[in-house]
Swiss-Prot record:
Role played: Binds 16S rRNA, required for the assembly of 30S particles and may also be responsible for determining the conformation of the 16S rRNA at the A site.
Coiled-coil ranges (or none): none
Keywords annotated in UniProt: Ribonucleoprotein, Ribosomal protein, RNA-binding, rRNA-binding
GN (gene name): rpsN
Species, as recorded: Xylella fastidiosa (strain Temecula1 / ATCC 700964)
Domain of life of the organism encoding this protein: Bacteria
Gene3D superfamilies (alphabetical): 1.10.287.1480
Designated name of the protein: Small ribosomal subunit protein uS14
Length: 101
């Protein structure tokens, strides 16, 4: 089980990333646009730098929904490998079964 503070920190980052997503996208469009002038690009990059660090989506970490484990998480299910195996063995996930060959 991950520390509660780490899980809460990640939830805070998700909220901030969602809150500033539109603003961040518009500033990045101005920066990468060929039509905008050099001064506009500099101004947009300064505004982008002043946004909170945690609002960047690259700072997010995929975590298991049940245990909060940061590694070995299957995006399709949102579960860590251990919890996914337990759920599959109980039959909680329809269509998923243990491989056998």
């Amino acid at each position: 089980m991950a520390k509660i503070s780490m899980i809460n920190r990640d939830l805070k980052r998700k909220r901030l990333a969602k809150k500033f997503a539109d603003k961040r996208l518009s500033l990045k469009k101005v920066i990468s646009s060929y039509a905008s002038s050099y001064e506009e690009k500099i101004e947009a990059s300064c505004k982008l730098q002043k946004l909170p660090r945690d609002s960047s989506p690259t700072r997010l970490r995929n975590r298991c929904e049940i245990s909060g484990r940061p590694r070995g998480v299957y995006c399709k299910f949102g579960l860590g490998r251990n919890k996914l195996r337990e759920a599959a063995m109980r039959g909680d996930i329809p269509g998923l079964r243990k491989a056998s060959w």
